[in-house]
Regions:
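Cleavable C-terminal sorting propeptides in eukaryotic secreted/cell-surface proteins
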Residues: 550-576
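Sec-dependent signal peptide recognition
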Residues: 2-10, 555-558
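Short, solvent-exposed turn/loop segments enriched in Gly/Ser/Thr/Pro and often Arg
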Residues: 169-172, 219-220, 435-443, 504-513
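Substrate-gating cap/lid region and adjacent catalytic-acid/histidine neighborhood
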Residues: 282, 290-478, 487, 494
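A structural signal for well-ordered alpha-helical segments within the folded catalytic domains
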Residues: 50, 107-110, 190-193, 197, ...
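Serine-hydrolase-like catalytic core of hydrolytic proteins
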Residues: 7-8, 99-284, 334-357
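Hydrophobic h-region of N-terminal signal peptides that target proteins for export
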Residues: 11-18, 564-567
Length: 576
């Protein structure tokens, strides 16, 4: 009887909704751009949170400023209310569910949302840590609204941290480049940097500590977090990082010429006719001028389509960060070597790539994805599938499908996360590695080959919102949400996910580790495990060696065959 009462009490307390009274406004705060008021969430015993929604950090990047670096927001006179999301940056929004807020699009979209505790406790006098979150969406979709507001206030901000979410340009707006000053590229990353500058400049007016800023993001937001960790332009703007289910590996960055070529094909598809295509300089000027005149909704549509079609018929491409001479200079190896010396919390879900599969033809789909995400390396893809997948199992068995999907998960996510963790640990930075394993089946998850924690499964436990369906937590959900959010909040506060009263101590990855330990996060089963992904990452070294040996053998055989053919032809001519 007592335990049942405690269970009900836990759910009511942890997920108590804010009062439904008329809108209550916060006291005004004086930001660097003007005076601002937000709205108040009252969670009863959990406390009150001020939500300042849609504060601009940058001017509209439209007209001649489309495809350029962002500019700081203009100041305003008087006092403004910020109680609703600002417009989202343009993207193709498909199948929005009724429980999600309506989306307004505008190129004037560079804004932040700030959630800060309104603490009346006289004992809480210190400045609060700040958690800055970058949303995901494959770099072509999404906005800060997709992670919600009330859940962030209730789950995170009531734990005495300030949370900031932000909009940034996605798709063509965020990554179109000509490789020169006409469209330098990496606009999205420059947006994030400007937002971080805004947070640093305004931290104290919201009660925050500008010397204790944590940057975190999921999926493309995790990749962006890694990119910001490697950029020399962002040093000092944040002090710890937590990339979730995403990092910047070989699939996450490219040369400007690649995107320029694809965008030139797209422009021609839309009607662009260069005057003199042999002149790169002239074509770039004309190309950017043309693309600035295209309706933003049309660019958003084609930016989303570009993930699957490159307008030249040669396969897929992505709108992603590029190497440049400023934000991401040099090679990937040099960028990784120059990663900021800050504490790191990073990890994955147990079956990341499960989110990309239907129930049919799992093996064939896995081969296709593995080939694509190894940049068309069919030999590597097939060798990996042969190594990890037991083909004696029935193709419709859960174990067979798990083995297939884990290979794709490794290629897209796990290998680069593992590499980031080891490389950062070798620089003597404290690194905490995890795998999120908790999963609760719902009607929306029945379309997948099996039930398990997949890409994005963890988000609702941090933010209290699921884009695909209404999130109605039970006791297990509450337990996991409490665990996961506490780990992230502790990391924001102490650069360490362990709290002062943690029952399960989370040890960091050793700087000498070749098989790093990790925290397995699951309901009533969260514990430290000795080897990340059960040693799968080390097995990829064997696979790469096999492939390299096979390629060497093929090259030598081809060379010997050509030499033999040449020798035979020469001998034949001698005796004619």
């Amino acid at each position: 009887m007592h335990s049942a009462w405690m269970a009900v009490t836990t759910i009511v307390f942890f997920y108590s909704r804010p009062s439904a009274d008329a809108l209550t406004l916060t006291a005004p705060v004086k930001t660097t751009h003007g005076r601002a008021q937000g709205k108040v969430y009252d969670f009863g015993a959990k406390g009150k949170v001020g939500a300042f929604m849609g504060i601009p950090y940058g001017r509209a990047p439209d007209g001649e400023f489309r495809f350029q670096k962002p500019r700081p927001a203009r100041t305003w006179r008087g006092q403004r209310r910020f109680t609703q999301y600002g417009p989202a940056c343009y993207y193709l929004a498909q199948n929005r569910k009724e429980h999600m807020p309506p989306i307004r699009f505008d190129e004037d979209c560079l804004s932040v949302n700030v959630f800060t505790p309104l603490n009346d406790d006289s004992n809480v006098k210190s400045k609060l840590p700040i958690m800055v979150y970058i949303h995901g969406g494959a770099y072509v979709m999404g906005s800060s609204a997709t992670v919600g507001d009330e859940g962030i206030a209730r789950i995170l901000a009531t734990q005495n941290v300030i949370v900031v979410t932000l909009n940034y340009r996605t798709g063509i707006f965020g990554f179109f480049t000509t490789g020169d000053s006409n469209a330098p590229g990496n606009q999205a990353l420059w947006d994030m940097r400007l937002a971080l500058q805004w947070v640093n400049e305004n931290a104290e007016v919201f009660g925050g500590d500008k010397k204790n800023i944590m940057l975190f993001g999921q999926s493309a937001g995790g990749s962006a977090t890694h990119a910001l960790l490697m950029s020399p332009t962002t040093k000092g703007l944040f002090h710890k990082a937590a990339p979730m289910s995403g990092s910047t590996g070989e699939n996450g960055i490219t040369q400007p010429s690649v995107i320029r070529s694809q965008m030139l094909n797209l422009a021609k598809y839309l009607g662009f006719k260069p005057t003199n295509e042999s002149s790169t300089k002239d074509t770039n000027i004309e190309l950017v001028s043309f693309m600035r005149q295209v309706e933003p909704s049309k660019l958003a549509l084609n930016g989303a389509l570009s993930v699957n079609y490159n307008y030249s018929g040669n396969g897929q491409f992505k709108l992603i960060p590029v190497y440049d001479n400023e934000f991401l200079p040099g090679t990937l190896e040099k960028l990784k070597a120059g990663i900021h010396d800050v504490p790191l919390l990073t990890g994955n879900t147990e079956y990341e790539a499960l989110a990309f599969f239907g129930k049919e033809n799992v093996y064939e789909a896995a081969i296709g994805m593995a080939t694509y995400y190894t940049k068309g390396d069919s030999m590597l893809a097939k060798t990996a599938m042969d190594y990890f997948v037991d083909k004696s199992l029935p193709k419709d068995s859960v174990e067979f499908m798990k083995q297939c999907i884990l290979v794709v998960s490794d290629i897209i996510f796990n290998k680069d996360i593992y590499s980031l963790a080891l490389q950062s640990a070798q620089k003597k930075n404290p690194v905490y590695l995890y795998t999120f394993k908790y999963f609760k089946p719902t009607p929306a998850t029945q379309r997948y080959p099996f039930q398990g924690a997949m890409h994005c499964s963890d988000l609702q436990y941090l933010f209290g919102l699921n884009e695909n369906e209404v999130y109605e937590p039970d006791l297990d959900d509450v337990i996991v949400s409490d665990q996961l959010s506490t780990y992230f909040v502790n990391f924001a506060k102490f650069s360490n996910p362990n709290g002062q009263n943690s029952e399960q101590k989370w040890e960091p990855v050793s700087d000498e580790a070749t098989k790093p330990q990790y925290m397995s996060i699951d309901v009533n089963a969260t514990q430290l495990h000795p080897v990340f992904m059960d040693g799968r990452m080390e097995k990829w070294n064997e696979i790469n060696q096999q492939v390299n040996s096979a390629r060497t053998f093929t090259r030598v055989s081809t060379l010997l065959l050509s030499m033999y053919s040449f020798s035979g032809a020469t001998t034949q001519r001698m005796f004619v």
